[in-house]
Amino acid sequence: MSPTFNASPNQLTLALSKGRIFTETLPLLEAAGIRVTEDPETSRKLILPTSDPAVRVVIVRASDVPTYVQYGAADFGVAGKDVLMESGMAGLYAPIDLNIARCRMSVAVPAGFDYANAVRQGARLAVATKYVQTAREHFAKKGVHVDLIKLYGSMELGPLVGLSDAIVDLVSTGSTLRANNLVEVEEIVQISSRLVVNQAALKLKRERLAPILDAFERASAALA
C-alpha cells in the first residue's frame, strides 16, 4: 500500500519554492525553532520533514504557492509580491512582509531604443512578460499603448530576436540585462516576499501558527 502524505489535523504544512526564497526562509524558520532536515536541491522528495514533527514543508512552483495555501493544501507559505499581484489574494491572509528575496519589477528595452520618446509619440509597443496582469495595469495607468506577449522563459530574448520592443521582468543587480544589451527604463514596483496564511487555518490552527508567525515577524523586522 502506498504511504499517505495527508497532514494530520494538528500538523502544519508550509509551501515553499526552491531557490532564493527557500534559502532566505531557512533563517526565519530557525528563528521559530524549526529546521528543514533535507535539502530540496539534492532530495527528490517534494514533501520535506523538519525538526518539528508537527511541521512539514512542501516544495512547489513559486507561482503555485498562493493556490496551495488558498485551497488549504498548505496552511501557510512564502510567495513573492510579484506572484501575489498576479494571482490575487482570495482566501489568503498576508500578515508579514518578510523582507527577503528583494528585487524590483521594471521595464527594460534594448540599449539605444528611445523608450521615453516612443511613449510621448503614442507608439504601440510589444512587451514580453510573464506578469501580464501587473504590466497591463501599469501601462494603462500611464496611458501607454501595448500589446502584451506572455512568456515563461527568458524575457531578455524577446527584444533580441524581434519578438518585442520591451520586457517587464524582475531585476536584482541588472547584470543579466547588461549582458544582453538591455537597459532598465522604468521601475514598476519594489518586490519582496510575503508570508501568506490560509484564512481557515488561521482560525482553526491559531495556537500552533501564532508562535511561528511571531518568530517570523521578529526575524524579518531585523532584516528591514
Swiss-Prot record:
Top enzyme category: transferase
Family annotation (PROSITE patterns): ATP_P_PHORIBOSYLTR
Pfam families: HisG
Metabolic or biological pathway: Amino-acid biosynthesis; L-histidine biosynthesis; L-histidine from 5-phospho-alpha-D-ribose 1-diphosphate: step 1/9
GO cellular component, one term: cytoplasm
GO BP terms: L-histidine biosynthetic process
Keyword entries, A-Z: Amino-acid biosynthesis, ATP-binding, Cytoplasm, Glycosyltransferase, Histidine biosynthesis, Nucleotide-binding, Transferase
Record-listed E.C. numbers: 2.4.2.17
Cellular compartments annotated: Cytoplasm
Record keyword Transferase present: yes
UniProt xrefs under InterPro entries: ATP_PRibTrfase_cat, ATP_PRibTrfase_CS, ATP_PRibTrfase_HisG, ATP_PRibTrfase_HisG_short
Top-level taxon of origin: Bacteria
Primary role: Catalyzes the condensation of ATP and 5-phosphoribose 1-diphosphate to form N'-(5'-phosphoribosyl)-ATP (PR-ATP). Has a crucial role in the pathway because the rate of histidine biosynthesis seems to be controlled primarily by regulation of HisG enzymatic activity.
Family to which the UniProt record says this protein belongs: Belongs to the ATP phosphoribosyltransferase family. Short subfamily.
Protein name per the record: ATP phosphoribosyltransferase
Gene name linked to the record: hisG
